């Protein structure tokens, strides 16, 4: 059961604020709020489940490459179409060169896939990602949002959000949507709407 709410201090609903944020190129949308407050459901309502590519911060506890992780999620091959090697390089140098080529191929293909298919990356529970990955993700997103890549980062308040909010490279490039705790009357609306859909009468 979904209940639309007005964003505190504005005349807009949370849905309208998210729509406005996603319509602005070059900005990263950052949604922060307590657990079970409807942050992910808000994204589903505005973006649509079919257009969302959802990743969790926990997905990067083992996956150390941001773009490879997303590429796997959407089914993009990590292998470069052509792998070049030169006899002038040692085996170690050849391996390094090939990995670098694969990295850029994966990154470019992921960006193209998202733009061509109008997909939006929703990175949920960002605080679960290891600190070093949080910083890397922040740097990666800072670079690609300028290219039309759409992303929403979802996290808890006062947790590990330093990599996003306090990253100097993202200063002026973040649109923050803070979700307030539920009010009693809003919870009552959820119950009333749910009972109505279930055709259950309440006194």
Feature locations, PLM:
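A short, basic N-terminal segment
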Residues: 1-26, 112
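Walker A/P-loop nucleotide-binding motif
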Residues: 23-44
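Conserved beta-strand scaffold positions in the cores of enzyme catalytic domains, especially
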Residues: 30, 52-55, 174-178
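A short hydrophobic beta-strand->loop->alpha-helix junction that borders the nucleotide-binding pocket
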Residues: 33, 53-63, 156
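Walker A/P-loop NTP-binding motif
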Residues: 45-51
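Conserved NTP-binding/hydrolysis module of P-loop NTPases
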Residues: 51-52, 61-92
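Conserved AAA+ ATPase "sensor/coupling" helix adjacent to the nucleotide-binding pocket
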Residues: 73-74, 189-200
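Mid-core helix/loop region of P-loop NTP-binding domains shared across ATPases and GTPases
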Residues: 77-123, 127-136, 140-150, 154-171, ...
């Amino acid at each position: 059961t979904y209940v639309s709410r007005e964003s505190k201090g504005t005349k807009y609903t949370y849905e309208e604020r998210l729509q406005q944020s996603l319509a602005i190129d070059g900005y990263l949308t950052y949604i922060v709020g307590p657990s079970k407050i409807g942050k992910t459901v808000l994204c589903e309502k505005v973006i649509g489940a079919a257009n969302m590519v959802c990743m969790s911060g926990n997905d990067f506890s083992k996956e150390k490459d941001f773009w490879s992780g997303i590429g796997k999620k959407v089914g993009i091959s990590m292998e470069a179409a052509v792998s070049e090697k030169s006899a002038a390089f040692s085996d170690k140098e050849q391996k390094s060169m090939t990995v670098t080529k694969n990295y850029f191929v994966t990154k470019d293909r992921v960006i193209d896939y998202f733009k061509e298919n109008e997909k939006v990356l929703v990175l949920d529970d960002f605080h679960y990602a290891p600190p070093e990955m949080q910083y890397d993700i922040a740097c990666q997103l800072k670079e690609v949002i300028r290219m039309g890549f759409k992303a929403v980062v979802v996290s808890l308040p006062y947790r590990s959000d330093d990599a996003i909010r306090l990253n100097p490279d993202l200063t002026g490039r973040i649109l923050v949507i803070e979700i307030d705790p539920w009010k009693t009357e809003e919870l009552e609306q959820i119950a009333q709407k749910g009972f109505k859909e279930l055709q259950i009468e309440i006194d």
